[in-house]
């Protein structure tokens, strides 16, 4: 790990101090050493931040630090277990908006990708329509082979963004590893795994070909829904840095007055937002993970078009089943069923009792039944469910935390359309359909067929497996007789790596101490 990564952490700590982020910590809840650290760190604040609220301090600091920190801020908004509920709530207000870069630079990016002048590729190419941390969007016009023209959206990656993300992620990994080493209580939250998830997400988001594929997959999955779709991708105009899709003319879901004036039923739109999200998550295991109002348009006929496939979520069949079983259990007040699902998934250590966990779940679920529709929040229920994880020693599941954050966003959009929206009434048909398909007789027949196929494959592989086992047995016998031998080059490599690692650790200790000093007092309460 380059020494520059340590200095990036120091810089981040300095910016956080200057923007007054340490004021998110309550000194009264800190030990004397922490209270002293707060006083020292606040001496470096800018005078202008003293009147700002916590959300403003956080967003200003992360915007100053750049795209990578905006992304990690959005990610930590899904991890209240790591940063505390208040900080997570403040981070949820963080908007992925940055100043545009010049249109001339965007045109250069297009020309570099396709080897032709931008004016030959597009009959028109607008100034930026929207700009975020990863890319910005322009409106263009292309001439089709038959002479007609077509309006398109041209998404252009920011120049040098990959290099910047890589450098910042190196620093994030250092911070996560040291956090796990020095703060044992954080190990349950798996900060290194969280950064790995962020890294993978960034890799996918920084290749616009994968975003095109994601939009295509989501569109195919939702083909049977007449009220939801994604933009068509212009496949013959594709590169890693450029994404071209059809231009969507419609009303954003945030334009409530416009939607009402156009005669759309806001309650139906709210229901479709949740119906489509749960269908994606529960049935398909692949969902649009950034479903805010600006990413959804309503087109003629009331069809919702979801744009921006840069952030997608994927959960496996077991995790989809886990989600569906939980929601169905709460709908029907089957708390023992929910508890058993947690134990079957291995999320709760076997030393705990299923009955005790079911009792805790009852305390979460019962207040929901009989409550007013506008007091019922599926996202809040899932958050309360996460709150009991510490009591039952449950390790955090980053992919499920990501799903929970997305559900919070989707629910917020639905309630902005219809404040009295009933989440459970909207969820029940989707979950009921899943239960009938996955737990009913047809599902048992399908699983039995899959089992027969797997058994047949195993029988076919037996000769090869037997040969491998015989070879391994001979090699193990040789090791037992002669000992484990390493060639000289390998030994020298081990020695060199160890020496370099020791030097980097020694150089990094003080750098980490400075950076963590700015962050630890905030994390203490999380």
Predicted segments — roles?
Residues 288, 415, 513-526:
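Juxtamembrane "helix exit" motif at the C-terminal ends of alpha-helical transmembrane segments
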Residues 1-136, 142, 164-195, 414:
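N-terminal accessory/targeting segments that precede structured cores
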Residues 73, 137, 154, 211, ...:
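Residue-level signature of catalytic and energy-coupling elements of molecular machines
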Residues 139, 150-157:
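Glycine-rich ATP phosphate-binding loop
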Residues 26-33, 46-48, 52-53, 196, ...:
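Helix-rich C-lobe and terminal helical cap/extension of kinase-like folds
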Residues 294-298:
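Hydrophobic residue at the +6 position relative to the catalytic HRD Asp in the kinase catalytic loop
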Residues 91-99, 111-112, 120, 162-287, ...:
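ATP-dependent phospho-/nucleotidyl transfer catalytic cores
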Residues 140, 284, 289-291:
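Residue immediately N-terminal to the catalytic "proton-acceptor" Asp
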């Amino acid at each position: 790990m380059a020494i520059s990564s340590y200095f990036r952490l120091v810089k981040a700590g300095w910016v956080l101090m200057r923007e007054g982020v340490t004021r998110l910590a309550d000194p009264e809840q800190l030990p004397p050493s922490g209270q002293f650290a707060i006083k020292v760190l606040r001496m470096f604040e800018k005078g202008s931040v003293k009147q700002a609220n916590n959300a403003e301090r956080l967003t200003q600091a992360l915007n100053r630090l750049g795209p990578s920190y905006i992304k990690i801020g959005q990610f930590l908004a899904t991890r209240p277990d790591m940063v505390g509920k208040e900080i997570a709530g403040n981070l949820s207000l963080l908007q992925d908006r940055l100043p545009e870069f010049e249109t001339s630079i965007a045109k250069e990016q297009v020309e570099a990708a396709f080897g032709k002048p931008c004016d030959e590729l597009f009959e028109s190419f607008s100034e930026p329509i929207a700009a975020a941390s990863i890319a910005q969007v322009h409106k263009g016009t292309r001439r089709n082979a038959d002479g007609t023209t077509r309006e398109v959206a041209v998404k252009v990656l920011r120049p040098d963004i990959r290099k910047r993300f890589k450098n910042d992620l190196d620093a994030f990994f250092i911070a996560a590893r040291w956090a796990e080493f020095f703060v044992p209580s954080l190990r349950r939250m798996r900060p290194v795994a969280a950064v790995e998830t962020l890294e993978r997400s960034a890799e996918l988001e920084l290749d616009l070909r994968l975003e095109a594929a994601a939009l295509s997959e989501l569109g195919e999955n939702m083909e049977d829904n007449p009220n939801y779709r994604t933009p068509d991708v212009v496949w013959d105009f594709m590169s890693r840095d450029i994404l071209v899709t059809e231009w969507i003319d419609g009303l954003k879901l945030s334009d409530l007055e416009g939607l009402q004036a156009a005669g759309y039923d806001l309650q139906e739109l709210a229901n479709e937002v949740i119906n489509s999200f749960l269908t994606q998550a529960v049935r398909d295991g692949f969902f649009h993970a950034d479903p805010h109002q600006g990413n959804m348009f309503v087109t003629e006929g009331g069809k919702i078009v979801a744009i921006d496939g840069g952030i997608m979520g994927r959960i496996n069949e077991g995790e989809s089943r886990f989600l569906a079983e939980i929601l169905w259990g709460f709908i029907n007040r089957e708390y023992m069923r929910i508890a058993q699902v947690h134990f079957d998934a291995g999320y709760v250590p076997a030393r705990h009792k299923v009955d005790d966990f079911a009792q805790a779940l009852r305390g979460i679920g019962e207040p929901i039944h009989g409550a007013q529709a506008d007091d019922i929040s599926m996202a809040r229920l899932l958050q309360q469910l996460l709150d009991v994880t510490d009591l039952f020693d449950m390790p955090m599941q980053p992919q499920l935390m990501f799903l929970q954050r997305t559900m919070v966003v989707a629910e917020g959009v639905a309630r902005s359309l219809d404040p009295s929206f009933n989440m459970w009434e909207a969820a029940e048909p989707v979950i009921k359909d899943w239960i009938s398909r996955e737990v009913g007789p047809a599902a048992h027949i399908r699983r039995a067929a899959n089992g027969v196929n797997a058994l047949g494959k195993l029988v076919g592989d037996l000769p090869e497996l037997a040969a491998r086992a015989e070879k391994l047995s001979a090699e193990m016998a040789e090791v037992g007789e002669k000992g484990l031998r390493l060639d000289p080059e390998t030994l020298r490599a081990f020695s060199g790596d160890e020496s370099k690692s020791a030097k980097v650790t020694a150089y990094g200790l003080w750098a980490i101490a400075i950076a963590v000093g700015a962050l630890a007092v905030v994390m203490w309460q999380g």
